[in-house]
């Protein structure tokens, strides 16, 4: 019986997940998301064709519209549960693989 109670709570949390896309996170949450999912669109500030990571200042700039930048912007989708203990990133690539592409 306890299992079904836990499962119900988990499913309720997943339903709430649908409304919280990290395309435009709250300012106080930006550091968390840019640290663990470095290549999502909201982590980058682009100007004059170059994109710089908003939080990790020591990361090299990336050309806007380069393969790594376009791939990350189009294909990576990161979501989370705002008021729960579960943080989840749904991405087509693992973060370390995408970081490797950007640093290549």
UniProtKB/Swiss-Prot annotation:
Q: Does the keyword Plastid apply?
A: no
Would you say which domain of life the source belongs to? Viruses
Transmembrane domains' residue ranges? none
Q: Which InterPro entries match?
A: ASFV_fam_110 (IPR004848)
Record keywords: Early protein, Signal
Endpoints of the signal sequence: 1-31
What induces it, per record? Expressed in the early phase of the viral replicative cycle.
What is the purpose of this protein? Plays a role in virus cell tropism, and may be required for efficient virus replication in macrophages.
The record's similarity note reads: Belongs to the asfivirus MGF 110 family.
This protein is called Protein MGF 110-2L
